[in-house]
């Protein structure tokens, strides 16, 4: 048996496939979904959504959203998506270093929130390279 997975962003369909499993970046931690999972609705934070097809994990950086799981169907509605390109690992590491500096130097509440979001995205990108 397999899961039917659809990932949709505001600008359109990102992913539509059958898969062996999926790991969602929920607000309470990583949430693994396999066939036969109980019905569930969960919020997603910025992080790595992983889809397992043909015994291989594919990472997708999601920028928050939510997921609905029912009857081996996984519908993921996300606020946005970031691409993970294999050749960009060193660039991702330098962006992560800059994001840490920006957060340390942030003074206003808005600067802190913006820098925190950028740090989460940069950190997810660097971690995603483990799966490609």
Swiss-Prot record:
<keyword id="KW-0934">Plastid</keyword>
<dbReference type="GO" id="GO:0046933">
    <property type="term" value="F:proton-transporting ATP synthase activity, rotational mechanism"/>
</dbReference>
<keyword id="KW-0375">Hydrogen ion transport</keyword>
<keyword id="KW-0406">Ion transport</keyword>
<keyword id="KW-0793">Thylakoid</keyword>
<dbReference type="InterPro" id="IPR001469">
    <property type="entry name" value="ATP_synth_F1_dsu/esu"/>
</dbReference>
<comment type="function">
    <text>Produces ATP from ADP in the presence of a proton gradient across the membrane.</text>
</comment>
<dbReference type="GO" id="GO:0045259">
    <property type="term" value="C:proton-transporting ATP synthase complex"/>
</dbReference>
<dbReference type="GO" id="GO:0005524">
    <property type="term" value="F:ATP binding"/>
</dbReference>
<dbReference type="InterPro" id="IPR036771">
    <property type="entry name" value="ATPsynth_dsu/esu_N"/>
</dbReference>
<keyword id="KW-0066">ATP synthesis</keyword>
<keyword id="KW-0472">Membrane</keyword>
<comment type="subunit">
    <text>F-type ATPases have 2 components, CF(1) - the catalytic core - and CF(0) - the membrane proton channel. CF(1) has five subunits: alpha(3), beta(3), gamma(1), delta(1), epsilon(1). CF(0) has three main subunits: a, b and c.</text>
</comment>
<comment type="similarity">
    <text>Belongs to the ATPase epsilon chain family.</text>
</comment>
<dbReference type="GO" id="GO:0009535">
    <property type="term" value="C:chloroplast thylakoid membrane"/>
</dbReference>
<keyword id="KW-0150">Chloroplast</keyword>
<dbReference type="Pfam" id="PF02823">
    <property type="entry name" value="ATP-synt_DE_N"/>
</dbReference>
<keyword id="KW-0813">Transport</keyword>
<protein>
    <recommendedName>
        <fullName>ATP synthase epsilon chain, chloroplastic</fullName>
    </recommendedName>
</protein>
<keyword id="KW-0139">CF(1)</keyword>
<dbReference type="InterPro" id="IPR020546">
    <property type="entry name" value="ATP_synth_F1_dsu/esu_N"/>
</dbReference>
């Amino acid at each position: 048996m397999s899961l039917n997975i659809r990932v949709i962003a505001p600008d359109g369909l990102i992913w539509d496939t059958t898969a062996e499993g999926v790991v969602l970046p929920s607000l309470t931690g990583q949430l693994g979904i396999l066939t036969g999972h109980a019905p569930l609705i969960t919020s997603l934070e910025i992080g790595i959504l992983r889809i397992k097809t043909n015994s291989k994990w594919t990472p997708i950086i999601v920028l928050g959203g939510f997921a609905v799981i029912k009857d081996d169907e996984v519908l993921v509605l996300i606020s946005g998506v970031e691409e993970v390109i294999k050749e960009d690992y060193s660039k991702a590491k330098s962006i992560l270093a800059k994001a840490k500096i920006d957060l340390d130097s942030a003074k206003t509440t808005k600067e802190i929130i913006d820098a925190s979001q950028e740090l989460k995205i940069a950190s997810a990108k660097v971690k995603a390279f483990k799966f490609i």
